Amino acid sequence: MLLRFTKMHGLGNDFMVLDLVSQHAHILPKHAKQWGDRHTGIGFDQLLIVEAPNNPDVDFRYRIFNADGSEVEQCGNGARCFARFVLDKRLTAKRQIRVETKSGIIELDVRSDGQIGVNMGAPRLVPADIPFQAPAQALSYQVDVDGATVELAAVSMGNPHAVLRVADINSAPVHELGPKIEHHPRFPARVNVGFLQVIDRHRAQLRVWERGAGETQACGTGACAAAVAAISQGWMDSPLLIDLPGGRLSIEWAGPGQPVMMTGPAVRVYEGQVRL
């Protein structure tokens, strides 16, 4: 059978989006891995699946597969593309959309200027909730990587993140440390790794090594986690502008127990069909 799909991106973080509300198919990890290959498939960072909800209090269910076939809990840039997609495809007329994810409910707001705001919910900082192995919660942790000590913050935005502060974003060891921290035994579910350079109290630059995808052009949940770490440690103040290789995100966070608000664009690239 042929399935219709849409290729989209949020700041260069690119997605294949499938509507399984009006189409019906059973998507497996092997399909995500096959389609995600940039040489022999369609090529993407993540596959986003739009489904009818299980919960009557939400509008849609949102599933996410990495290009390596692993299903993950959350994707912030994908959430913005999800909102743009369901409106463009007339699956809803709402501009405030509630979506069920593997890690909970998020709220999407499609604004008149085309930007999309996402209420990502409150960050989780208790180590067991991330998950991260540590005896107690702290603002930062020291982790042994190949005999060297790396200081990092650990945050869950529905998916796990490690945040490292660096002096120079251009020389940050993203490809050296990223995969080692991603697979570090203290992160039993693996982890996304952000490298953050603080510019001033409200501006920063960020590169992210994504779990199951490698370095991407942008990572929405990574920007949220970096903002939480920077505000918690007193490096920065809300609101924040975070520049990633693919563009800029606006992040607001009022402090512990409060939701993180992310705002940025979502772009449709092309439509296609793929054989299942």
UniProtKB/Swiss-Prot annotation:
Catalytically driven reaction(s): (2S,6S)-2,6-diaminopimelate = meso-2,6-diaminopimelate
Uppermost EC category: isomerase
Documented EC number(s): 5.1.1.7
Important for dimerization (site feature) positions: Y270
Active site: C75 (proton donor), C219 (proton acceptor)
A Pfam cross-reference name: DAP_epimerase
Known function: Catalyzes the stereoinversion of LL-2,6-diaminopimelate (L,L-DAP) to meso-diaminopimelate (meso-DAP), a precursor of L-lysine and an essential component of the bacterial peptidoglycan.
Listed GO MF terms: diaminopimelate epimerase activity
Biological processes annotated in GO: lysine biosynthetic process via diaminopimelate
Record's subcellular location: Cytoplasm
Residues annotated for substrate binding in this entry: N13, Q46, N66, G76, N77, N159, N192, E210, R211, G220, T221
Annotated pathway: Amino-acid biosynthesis; L-lysine biosynthesis via DAP pathway; DL-2,6-diaminopimelate from LL-2,6-diaminopimelate: step 1/1
Family in the record: Belongs to the diaminopimelate epimerase family.
Alphabetical UniProt keywords: Amino-acid biosynthesis, Cytoplasm, Isomerase, Lysine biosynthesis
Protein name: Diaminopimelate epimerase
Keyword Isomerase set for record: yes
Oligomeric form and interacting partners: Homodimer.
Domain of life, per lineage: Bacteria
